[in-house]
Design a protein with these regions (language model features):
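Compositionally biased, low-complexity segments
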Residues: 8, 26-28, 229
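Bacterial N-terminal signal peptides
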Residues: 19-31
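Compositionally biased, intrinsically disordered low-complexity regions
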Residues: 12, 28, 234-235
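Carbohydrate-active catalytic/glycan-binding domains of CAZyme proteins
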Residues: 36-238
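Glycine-centered signal
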Residues: 14-15, 31-35
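N-terminal secretory signal peptides that target proteins for export/translocation
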Residues: 1-17
């Protein structure tokens, strides 16, 4: 689980039907004795993204259009807006804008492996704001019908030590891949080719860690495995 004073990603143990249960990490737990509780109500969300803070409210997006929002991190309701439909989005604040990544995919077991990961920007996540307007989606990664990879389950990471922006993608039946994006445009860096960094992981995510000798790692949402690297651009190890 990624967490800091702005956002964290929730990892559900059940992929087919994910409901968002937020355990009061919004304020960052300072004591292990704090008792975690489920959020109020029963809003449904599939493949929830990182939770992003925008103008005092919290937003998360899921597969299909839309998502949830909350004023306190406990009580959630529908109303977040994300066009493009697609699957398994992620959201990251960069400067004063929000970058959203999502996938348009053939669907693995139910279809083929043809897919795209797209990115788009918005100045705000509040659909009632006059500044609310998504930019045109841009394809930043793709997979073909017969590839051992599906361009799905995007995970964004802005390296706080270098300012470089990374995107991981892939799923349970093939390679997990990594590409570098331009943090100013959201496009893939010119000449940057995908790198295979893992295999057969479900819905991975890139997470920054400040331990002694590990700066980043790639982790499955289902917490079955993780791999680590001193930097996203170098080899990962189990």
């Amino acid at each position: 689980m990624k967490q800091n004073n702005v956002f964290f990603r929730y990892f559900s143990p059940v992929a087919a039907q994910q409901k968002l249960y937020v355990a009061a990490l919004v304020a960052l737990l300072s004591s292990s004795a704090y008792k975690a509780e489920a959020q109020v109500g029963e809003p449904f969300i599939h493949d929830p993204s990182t939770i992003a803070l925008c103008d005092g409210k919290y937003y998360t997006f899921g597969t299909g259009e839309g998502g949830l929002w909350s004023e306190d991190g406990w009580t959630w309701q529908g109303g977040a807006v994300r066009p493009g439909r697609g699957a398994a989005p992620d959201v990251l604040k960069i400067g004063d804008r929000y970058l959203v990544a999502y996938s348009a995919t053939g669907g693995g077991l139910g279809g083929n492996h043809r897919g795209d990961v797209l990115t788009m920007w918005n100045k705000t996540l509040d659909p009632k704001s006059p500044d609310f307007k998504y930019t045109k989606p841009i394809v930043v990664a793709s997979s073909l019908d017969d590839e051992d990879c599906d361009a799905i389950d995007a995970g964004l990471l802005l390296d706080p030590t270098t300012g470089r922006l990374w995107l991981s993608y892939g799923t349970y039946f093939g390679f997990i891949r990594l590409v570098e994006l331009d943090p100013k445009t959201g496009k893939r860096m010119e000449g940057n080719e995908p790198v295979n960094i893992a295999i057969d992981c479900e819905a991975t995510d890139l997470i920054y860690r400040t331990t002694k000798d590990i700066s980043t790692f790639l982790q499955s949402k289902f917490l079955r495995n993780h791999i680590i690297a001193n930097h996203p651009s170098v080899a990962f190890e189990h």
